[in-house]
Design a protein with these regions (language model features):
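Amphipathic alpha-helical assembly/interaction segments
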Residues: 1-124
Length: 124
C-alpha cells in the first residue's frame, strides 16, 4: 500500500480497510494460478467479492449517518462470506491447497470478526 494517501479522516487509515486490502492482495496472488478457463467464472467472482469487501468499507466511511454506515458495512460482511464460499469451491476444484485454503479462510474469518467489532463500535 505504499504511496496511498493517509490524510486525516481517510478510509485508508482504517485498520479494517487495510486488513481487507492485504487479504485482497493474497486473493489476487492465489487467483493468478487458477486455470485460464476459469477467468470469467470463479476467478472473476472471487476477485469481485474480495474487492467489494474493501470497497464497501471505504464507501461506509463516506456515509453521513451511523445507520447508513452500518448498513453498508453489513454488505461488506456479506461479501466476506461470499469470498469464503468461493475459496471453498476453489479448494473443491483443487485450484488451491488445503493449507492455502485454511490460511485464507482464517484471514477472512478474522476480518469478519474485526468488521463486527467495528460495526458494534459504531452502534454505541
Amino acid at each position: 500500500m505504499d504511496g496511498l494517501p493517509t490524510t486525516h479522516k481517510d478510509f485508508h487509515q482504517l485498520d479494517i480497510w487495510r486488513n481487507g486490502y492485504e487479504a485482497l492482495m493474497k486473493i489476487y496472488d492465489v487467483t493468478a494460478t487458477f486455470p485460464p478457463d476459469e477467468r470469467y467464472s470463479i476467478t472473476s467472482q472471487i476477485l469481485r467479492s474480495a474487492n467489494s469487501t474493501i470497497a464497501n468499507i471505504a464507501e461506509s466511511h463516506g456515509r453521513f449517518s451511523y445507520n447508513d454506515k452500518i448498513r453498508v458495512l453489513y454488505i461488506a460482511r456479506g461479501e466476506i462470506c461470499e469470498t469464503r464460499s468461493h475459496l471453498a469451491v476453489a479448494l473443491g476444484r483443487k485450484y488451491i491447497s488445503k493449507d492455502r485454503f485454511i490460511t485464507l479462510n482464517n484471514i477472512y474469518c478474522q476480518l469478519s470478526k474485526n468488521l463486527n467489532l467495528y460495526i458494534n463500535s459504531l452502534k454505541r
